[in-house]
Amino acid sequence: MMLYFTDAQTQQSVAVNAEYIVVVFTAKNEDGSEKVVINTTTGNLVVTEPYLDVVGRLNAVQ
């Protein structure tokens, strides 16, 4: 199932196949703000959605 998130860098909507998500975590930027990172089998995606929203969407399809 595809999940849609907003890419933090481009502000574009990005589709991510839930089957390929490995882990979701938060990381601090250079300015100290926290961003949510989705790690997939092909790389990382930094998104603008809150951590609990991302995890909630992922849990809904599992």
Question: Can you annotate each of these PLM segments?
Answer:
Residues 2-62:
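Acidic, Ser/Thr- and proline-rich intrinsically disordered linker/docking segments
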